């Protein structure tokens, strides 16, 4: 029996990174977690690292500013997965260029998964500013990966359930509203809602799979392809409470960007892409893409219905 690939996870204490670490350990991969020396002053992250260590992970100290430490870490594994923070923290995405250089020098990596996990940046040339900067930076990382001929898989995980299912896609809210809910336009634009733990499982499933080599893997669980209105209706049925629905036009929604912080403007522009334009599901997967739930039907993914039960 072929041995499982050794996996290095960069950003393993982050929101999605911790799920990938958990999945890697659960699926039997020798798991390594890169951590920066600055982390030792953060008690919560240290506790998380020690918990992973207790479960079998190996901790490797390295820094984006220390090329040799990165190369040394990369040489110990077969696969590198980056889950560094994106969003308005754009410098973290571009720091992956240093990781690409280390992987290129090490020369032993069989697969690299860069930090994407949201909308496919390769399809977002039209994206609105300032939210487009996230996609621009991710494309720069892709270009570096491909120029270095590094075997890779890009992952488009769509909407993280923890951020938007509970809050019914209300900006700045992650728990269900009790009285009213804003619907974007008519609320009927289809989106894809994915449990973060499932993102971790699908990611680890993909790293040794030849079907995902040098392709984009889209995570589209069929039962979770739902409009915002459908998600709201599911919550109303589950909770037994009706909400006052307020439709907001695209013009009024975008007018709300004025006077907001840079980070909030990025969030608003991403909501526009998802819930007005429908950029999560307004395209067919092409020959350079694959779909996770079709590749791995054995994964019992979490449906939106069952995810919502935790909020009762």
UniProtKB/Swiss-Prot annotation:
GO molecular function: lariciresinol reductase activity; pinoresinol reductase activity
Reaction equation(s) it catalyzes: (+)-lariciresinol + NADP(+) = (+)-pinoresinol + NADPH + H(+); (-)-secoisolariciresinol + NADP(+) = (+)-lariciresinol + NADPH + H(+); (-)-lariciresinol + NADP(+) = (-)-pinoresinol + NADPH + H(+)
Residues binding NADP(+): 11-17, 36, 45, 142
Other observations noted: Leu-164, Gly-267 and Phe-271 are involved in enantiospecific binding of (+)-pinoresinol while in PLR_Tp1, a 'Val-267' and a symmetric substitution between Phe and Leu favor binding of the (-)-antipode of pinoresinol.
PANTHER family: PINORESINOL REDUCTASE 1-RELATED, PINORESINOL REDUCTASE-RELATED
Family to which this protein belongs: Belongs to the NmrA-type oxidoreductase family. Isoflavone reductase subfamily.
Subunit comment: Dimer.
Record protein name field: Bifunctional pinoresinol-lariciresinol reductase 2
Organism: Thuja plicata (Western red-cedar)
Primary gene name: PLR_Tp2
